[in-house]
Amino acid sequence: MEMLQLSINKHLAAQADSVIIVAGDFNHANLKSVLPKFHKYVNFPTREKNILDQVYCNISNAYKASPLPHLGLSDHLSLSFIPAYKPLICRQKTATKTVKVWTEEATAALQDCFEVTDWGVFAEGTDLNGHTSAVLDYISFCTENVTESKTVKVFPNQKPWLNSEVKTLLKARDTAFRSGDPQSYKDARKNLRRGIIKAKRSYQQRIEAHFYSNNSRGMWQGIKTLTGYNNNTTATISSDSTLPDTLNQFFARFDRHSENSDTLPVPPTNKDLLQLQPHQVRATLRRVNVRKAPGPDGVPGRVLKACADQLAEVFTTIFNLSLLQSVVPACLKSATIVPIPKRNTVNCLNDYRPVALTPIITKCFERLILPFIRSAIPADLDQHQFAYRANRSTEDAVIMATHTALTHLDQSNTYVRMLFVDFSSAFNTVIPQKLVMKLSNLGIGSSLCAWLLDFLRNRPQRVRMGDRTSSTLILNTGTPQGCVLSPLLFSLFTHDCSPIHPTNTIVKFADDTTIVGLIKNNNESAYREEVKHLTDWCSNNNLVLNTAKTKEIILDFRKSKKTVLPTLSIKGEEVERVESFKFLGVHISADLTWAVHTSYQVRKAHQRLYFLRKLKQAHLPRPLLVNFYRASIESIL
């Protein structure tokens, strides 16, 4: 039973939506003792007065069981099972969504409208919050007036090649079937087959046209649609009306009130005041990605990009007022969280990944602030932080860690302990006051520090699931997700997390932190003090160590090594020792060979060969197949 349980659980882990049927002569064994979520289907005797034969399935009411006479000399009855369930694709409801239809006339009308608008009236008799809200509301109002909203249905089995002509032929076939005329039905089916072939060929030609016109984005979209590449099935949205509020509380669980004990930066002065120019704002608006979803303000990126010339002046005024007053309007730092299931089967709140939607205009503001922060940071700051730095990548971090270990292992009587630290929601636990104090100590001006402090505090947040929205919570902790400044701010927050012993190295890539302890003559005191120092640093900076996900590898090639080296504990909890660990995309093994990593990459390449075969079956041209192979398969080998 245990072997059967392990086999079934392994299959469900890989394909959570699959249907599993287990049938056989179980005698008096009960599969529900090890798989309680499976359902029995035989409730009548199969041999004399005993139920010895049984069928289990992970779907309830999937089949209707009935007895049949035994076959030949068998003393067991035969069993008949008739499907009594609807397939998953039939059980999924048709989704409807509203899309805005943009025309050239709509864009021109918006530009003309904003060109003649007197933006000064929005600032009269109100503060910066009211001024900004009025401007954004006016832009949204004008956008609604010049665009048309269209409601479309999205079916669970929607095919990319399905067009209006095929839909018309489908209706004609159904009409012919209901008419009862065999010849009409035969002709309608023939026309439908021809229409589908024509639609598929047209879709294929459209993908080829993207390839030959160097439209890489359109080409890859078509390829992914044809193959299902990176097409993750999302879980069904729960019908629980309280789930959005519950998730909002869960995502805000690290929030804490402002600490008055923390010394705040000195008030800003005009000496270090930042000033933005209209041409800078205009250039940033023109670089907006129009495909990004709008934030809570509802202003789409397409409006900001198309009307950059008309909106540059008013947003320059708002941005400079914000920098002058060191105040960020609440509407610019609000966020809507859209929970995305991490896996098909959601069992707990932690199975949802929060995806934050923030105003696009706020991202533009952040991009304008970013160069000022970078210019104030010393060039040699935190040389072992490899994230969000020019000319640095994950490969550099992996090379640093492995090179440090290998160089030490060349010496006699040495070994290396590598601790891969895991934080719980690291970005969400940053205390703004502590961050701003560190920025001030790094030489960033008091005006910018005060602005950043207000940017990180009193942030409205709500959760949206379908057509349901939670109540709003105000957050005062963490660097907001989906913002341009957050990654850099977090890397600056951890710049003082440095080793206290020269025999240890701390390699950082954002919140991925690794301690490389170089040990000689079995003296681990420096390494263990380093771990203790990191634990204390995390406690002082409100970062939560997740010991359960923290792993350790020991690299020891000594011939006379001890059989068992002492374990490592963090706050009384033992750290798991593993033989290999996936570090920034590379599997590092205790024997420092490439066997585990190579096997993983080969398996990944084999999986992607399936997509290549799907494209070949779609009769795509050879150059496009070669392009897909080089980008998706050859690149990982």
Predicted regions and their residues:
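Arg/Lys-enriched, amphipathic patches
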Residues: 22-23, 28-29, 86-237, 287, ...
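Basic, alpha-helical interaction scaffolds
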Residues: 105-140, 343, 573-637
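Conserved pre-catalytic core of RNA-dependent polymerases
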Residues: 267-480, 517
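Active-site regions of metal-assisted phosphoester/phosphodiester hydrolases
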Residues: 1-35, 41, 64-68, 74-87, ...
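Catalytic palm subdomain of template-directed nucleic-acid polymerases
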Residues: 31-32, 423-442, 513-539
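Active-site palm subdomain of RNA-directed nucleic acid polymerases
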Residues: 11-14, 20, 369-385, 408-409, ...
